[in-house]
Amino acid sequence: MQVTMRGISKAFGPVKVLENVEFTLRGGEIHALMGENGAGKSTLMKILSGVHRADAGEILLDGRKAELRSTEAAEAAGIAIIHQELNLIPQLSVMENLFLGREPSRFGIIDYAAMRREARAQLEALGAGGIDPDAEAGSLSIGQQQMVEIAKALALNARVLIMDEPTAALTEREIDRLFELMAQLRENGAAIVYVSHRMEEIFRVCDRISVLRDGCFVGEREIARTDFDEVVRMMVGREIGDRYPKREAAPGEVRLKVENLADENMIAGIGFEVRAGEVLGIAGLMGSGRSDILKTLFGAKRRTAGRVELDGKELKVAAPGDAIAAGLGFVPEDRKSKGLVLGMSLRENATLVHLDQYARLGVVSAAEEKRAVDGLIAQLRIRARDAELDVKSLSGGNQQKVVFAKWLANPPKVLLLDEPTRGVDVGGKAEIYHIVNQLAAAGTAIVMVSSELPEVLALSNRILVLHEGRQAGIFDAAGCSQETLMAAATGGAVHSETRKQA
């Protein structure tokens, strides 16, 4: 199927999101759609998939004008979307989510046995056969939920498949399997739109690329005839300097010391030190316990063994409030459910952790809050009209900056980062890297989990690798490679010269 979108414009109230955008998609190709957060990528794809209606413009499918007034109309036309934000019903089983609204039946009664068989087949085709079709969707990890979302879209046998950040929560193996499936779909004539901030993936799997900036179409390129620098210039309209800015200051004294850390069900025997001004990266496959270390240190999971010291004194944390009071901060993996209160304003979210700083006689001063938050908005380049804007209306990258803003108002001694750049565009990533370096230069000890190995290697001084909840080693980032980290993460042998003990 060939898709042509002409003159597409869309506004939400007074805010213009898209203006006269052009986009074409051919059958048998994987077409990347890129742009900074807030550029309009997701809105354009929601128009194509029937979630939103354009204010102006037209959509042609194989040369014929199409009226895609709903997701049902889009699906009937052969268009399916995998949303950036997970869209499963937590209380339903995996198989019920996969076949919601189109359940197989016999004699008017849902055929659960057939549904289970088909669900298992769809998951196995994705290399996700370990997911139980009867499990509640809400009980799955974020990565597993993402695989279910992908299986749900593939089950529709769509001729046009829109993938909005599909790999954000996947392991390297799952990503490889997804790319194999995408190649098969392309060979079968499917048209795929691939929305991602991961430049390496774009150049690995896509044929063409279109770029949006500030709601406008900037241009289109053949992947084979462009490069990273040109795409970045098209996206941001400027040079962003070094992709991974360097940090010059040497680490100071030991700030955080962890010995024999264990939680209730995932990690055991974890030990490391982090110095003031140092970034300790944590790498490993999904489900290896990376996030569990951070949650246990922050009091979001119960510690069952081990000792933790902060500045040489034992740290006892029973709940997140204890961790915050001691000087720990946490940027969680899932910003929407764990890092932000979506019904509150940018100002209220940014000051939530340290409200006492803005209170007089027990009453919070909104004016004091606003003065502080206006400074943070400028410092972090948060794209928002003002501090009173609902945080739920911001793009993903700007929401992530608000999560950082909570801790920048009163920088912690130790900052725990769980996938800090997930769903953030290349310009936003550079800004977050700068924030991390600023905090480290000011003496904050940083522990960072990331699934992007180039990011871990570039930002970290040392890297702790996990394998199935156990420590596989600690490596000097300067003398390490992605292959070494993956070998350790999968339980393989590694060269001893890059390995260090905690």
Curated annotation (Swiss-Prot):
KW Methyltransferase (keyword) present: no
Stretches assigned to the ABC transporter domain: 3-239, 249-493
GO molecular function, one term: ABC-type D-ribose transporter activity
Pfam families associated with the record: ABC_tran
Membrane among keywords: yes
Subcellular location: Cell inner membrane
Membrane topology: Peripheral membrane protein
Reactions catalysed, as given in the entry: D-ribose(out) + ATP + H2O = D-ribose(in) + ADP + phosphate + H(+)
CDD domains: ABC_Carb_Monos_I, ABC_Carb_Monos_II
The EC number(s) this enzyme carries: 7.5.2.7
Main location group: membrane
Origin superkingdom: Bacteria
Oligomer status and interactors: The complex is composed of an ATP-binding protein (RbsA), two transmembrane proteins (RbsC) and a solute-binding protein (RbsB).
Similarity comment: family membership: Belongs to the ABC transporter superfamily. Ribose importer (TC 3.A.1.2.1) family.
Protein name: Ribose import ATP-binding protein RbsA
Organism per entry: Chromobacterium violaceum (strain ATCC 12472 / DSM 30191 / JCM 1249 / CCUG 213 / NBRC 12614 / NCIMB 9131 / NCTC 9757 / MK)
